[in-house]
Each structure stands twice: as C-alpha cells, then as structure tokens.
Amino acid sequence: MNEPKYKRVMLKLSGEALSGEKGFGFDFDFTKEISEQIKKLVDMGIEVGAVVGGGNIWRGRSGSEMDRTTADYMGMLATCINALALQDSLEQLGVNTRVQTAIEMKEIAEPFIRRRAMRHLEKERVVIFASGTGNPYFSTDTAAALRAAEIEADVILLAKKVDGVYDKDPHKYDDAKKYNKLSYIEVLDQGLQVMDSTATSLCMDNDIPILVFGLDEPCNIIKAVTGEEIGTLVSNSK
C-alpha cells in the first residue's frame, strides 16, 4: 500500500451513501464497510473529520409545500441521526469518535468548538460534524467546506454514487465525458455537479482541493488518500 498523500482529511458522505442500494434509511452492512475503511485511515495515521448528509431520511428541498427554513432544520436533524449511526458503527470497530453539532443538543453530542475538534483530531479521534452549518439555506456540502477550512484539512474527499465529475449525467447519457482534473472556475462556469456554488467558492477561496470519487467500492476511500488515480480532482491548478 502506498504512503498516505494527506495528513488530515474531510470526508463528505451523502446520506444516500449510508442507505446503500436501498435509497432510504440505513444499509448497516454497507455502513460497516465504510467504517472499516475509515478505521484503516486512522490506523495509517490520517486525521479524519466527516460530514454526513441527510438525504436518506429527508431533503430540505423535498418539503416544497413547507416553509423553507423549517424544511432545512428538519434536514439538519436528519444529519444528526446519520452522524450517530456512523459513530456507533465506528465505535463497534474500536474507533474513538466524537460527534459535534452546529445546533446544541448536549445530551447526544458536543457543540461544535473548533479548538476542541482540532484536539480530538490530534488525538486520533474521528470527528463527525452534524447539523450542517446550523443555518437554513446552506447545504451539507457547504458545511463540509466550512469545517474543512476551520480544521485546516488538506483535502475534501467527496464520496458520491458516481465515480467522478462528468460533463452530463452518466446515468442518462452513454457519451458522458469524465474529467480527471478540473479547476474551481471551470466547475462554476460550466455548472458542473460537484458541490453547490457556495461550497465550491469557499473551497476555491481557501485553496482546499476536492477529490470526487465513487463509493461503489468502499476501498476507494483508501485509494483516494494514497494518491491512486481515481475520480476527479478539483483544485486551483488544473
């Protein structure tokens, strides 16, 4: 196995990633596979922060008949459920973890405190950041970019259901072209589906590369941190 390319990473998992092929709820076997890969990262000496979406339970934009703010807060609560599920899965493997939330719920998690999060990472604890940014109208992608900047992560590992960034939906178009490398400006100008524009701009301003790869094989997480050719790398230099 190659030496790790990064010392501190931010892993962004969609809620759908925890649901596996089900698309809703939890696939505990698949969640365990992801946790096993995270454990390997820790064993390699890599400090791991994680942000989990809530799309397997609720999406703010799904509540079209609801007040947007209320729908977004429901989505934040969904990310907390996912964070606890991931924490439990990791701890069953003997991985020390902490969940920190942007909205205080001290009975189940710590409030987000940057210095405390940094200390946990230095002590080889996986820190799972939940409830997004704590504000409506911001996605969990933006939360991942924000927390990555705050903890000074070397890279955002963006695990998706597709194996990189394409010029159009590869599930709909057989001639979709995959990119190996992109600049942030290209992503924004072409409206490519990496992160939303707020998250992408935040990464660009703070020079945080984004590595987009597929979770069809959980071992891709290891490949991503050891520098293997995988997915699409988005950075300030193409």
From Swiss-Prot:
SUPFAM superfamilies: Carbamate kinase-like. Allosterically activated by GTP. Inhibited by UTP. Its EC number is 2.7.4.22. Keywords: Allosteric enzyme, ATP-binding, Cytoplasm, Kinase, Nucleotide-binding, Pyrimidine biosynthesis, Transferase. CDD domains: AAK_UMPK-PyrH-Ec (cd04254). Pathway: Pyrimidine metabolism; CTP biosynthesis via de novo pathway; UDP from UMP (UMPK route): step 1/1. Gene3D superfamilies: Acetylglutamate kinase-like. GO terms for cellular component: cytoplasm. It catalyses: UMP + ATP = UDP + ADP. ATP binds at residues 12-15, 55, 59, 166, 169. InterPro entries: AceGlu_kinase-like_sf, Asp/Glu/Uridylate_kinase, Uridylate_kinase, Uridylate_kinase_bac. UMP binds at residues 54, 72, 133-140. Catalyzes the reversible phosphorylation of UMP to UDP. This is Uridylate kinase. It comes from Clostridium botulinum (strain Langeland / NCTC 10281 / Type F).
